[in-house]
Amino acid sequence: MSDPQPTAVDVRESVTSSLRVAVNRQIFRGILFSMGATALAMARLGVPQSMIWSFAKLQARNACRALGVRVTIRGKELAAEGGPYIFTPNHQAHIDIAALLGYLPGNNRFASKKELFDEPVLGAVMRTLGMLPVDRDDPMKSIDVLNRALREGHSIIIFPEGTRSRDGRLLPFKKGAFVAAIEMGYPIVPVIVKGTRRVMPKGGYLSIHPGNVEIVVKPPIATRGLDYQDREWLRDAVREIIAEEFSRPIAA
């Protein structure tokens, strides 16, 4: 039997979807450029970094809305007070960053590999937004950078997988975030991001489809009293919490 031929409705939906993705690509580029340029200009004018971060948060939310990405967050009240915290979300797509920036409560800081800060434009924007360079070859220096931000009252966002998942499955967690949390004595907050892989599939250059994204914040896990020998237990406990929630469908 021959394969069924696409109907006129199928063709129309495919064309409409392709057009929306193309439009979204330009919207995303435009918002990224305008946010970066405005943040740099604000910094040159001496605007406080807290105001620049608030502007970036607003722009991230506006970007999600303009792209047709509907973000909901559950459990944010668990991290609304008592911080600062170390947030450890899973990582499925680049748009995770926009969703977390826009919707996770607080004046937070992303930790990112230091090589990205060497990019002339990207690095300047990241520094302006207060993002934190992490040197995987110098963990003690990285802990010092993170600790300084925490002492200033900023929660930190670290992706424990270290990179985006290629197939949508949760990757093994690296130990760095958990060693840092134990060394510094700040609580870890497991965060689960769902739906972003369908919204922004890996491999498609800035291909963003309208869809639903859910962020789930779990209760903080205290690290005071833990020592270096507990790093693997803490890593595995956090991964288990994230894996259990990640396996559930997005709440209606």
Regions flagged by a language model, labelled:
Residues 71-75, 95-97, 143-145, 201-203:
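A generic local structural motif
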Residues 51, 59, 96-99, 112, ...:
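Hydrophobic alpha-helical segments typical of transmembrane helices
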Residues 60, 128-132, 162-163:
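Short, basic, glycine/proline-bearing loop/turn elements
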Residues 63-64, 126, 149, 181:
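A generic structural signal for well-ordered alpha-helical segments
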Residues 74, 111-113, 134-136, 160, ...:
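Thr-Gly-centered strand-to-loop micro-motif
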Residues 33-53, 65-67, 79-138:
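Catalytic core of membrane glycerolipid acyltransferases/transacylases, capturing the structured
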Residues 1-19, 140-252:
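Non-catalytic C-terminal accessory region of glycerolipid acyltransferases
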Residues 2-85:
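Membrane-anchoring hydrophobic helices of lipid-metabolizing enzymes
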